[in-house]
Amino acid sequence: MQVIDINNNELVVQYSKKNNISLAIIGPENPLANGVVDMLGEAGIQAVGPTKEMAKIEASKSFARDLLLEYNIPACPKYKVFKSTEGVKAFLTDLGEGFVVKYDGLAGGKGVKVSGDHLNSHEEAMKYCDEIIQKGGKFVVEEKLVGEEFSLMSFSDGKTLIHMPAIQDHKRALDGDLGPNTG
């Protein structure tokens, strides 16, 4: 049973004050991207989770890629950000058959489509780009990287930085990395 709408920051703060909550642990991506940690902090309630500014690295694929490029981090694939289909076909041709199309926002783990897995042609990629545009979004087209994906979460209080063990998120519905992404 959901007590309140966790995507409404004001309701979260009101509920926390009313119930004398002194520490909130925020997990879902939407409230983090909406700045609930910031608002709880302003209300004097401690919260575990990134601020709205820090959550941008998860909430925006283009922000994350631009950050890698800005700081010369060698893990950045060749990419471009688009708001329309202008230039997409030419960039897909440049990338060849190894490409990825990513919705530039939160999509519950379902905004990324990879060539060979979800997209079997440049035409299918263009259709997905059109779907994103129809919803008013922008998107990233990038070269497909091959290898093991992992997540590394780190925690900081502003002075100390502690890394958790690297983990893998197996999103596919079926064994053997098959089936649709589950989010």
Model-derived regions: residue spans:
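A conserved helix-loop-beta module that forms one wall/lid of the active-site cleft
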Residues: 45-111, 116
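Glycine-rich phosphate-binding loop signature in dinucleotide/nucleotide-binding domains
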Residues: 16-21, 94-95, 134-135
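Phosphate-binding core of ATP-grasp and ATP-grasp-like enzymes
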Residues: 132-136, 146-182
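Short, charged, surface-exposed secondary-structure boundary motifs
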Residues: 13-17, 56-62, 174-176
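Short, well-ordered alpha-helical microsegments
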Residues: 32-34, 88, 149-150
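Conserved ATP-binding module of the ATP-grasp superfamily
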Residues: 66, 74-77, 96-101, 115-151, ...
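Short beta-strand-to-turn element immediately C-terminal to the catalytic PLP-Schiff-base lysine
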Residues: 82, 112-118, 154-157, 164-165
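ATP-binding N-terminal substructure of ATP-dependent carboxylate-amine bond-forming enzymes
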Residues: 1-53
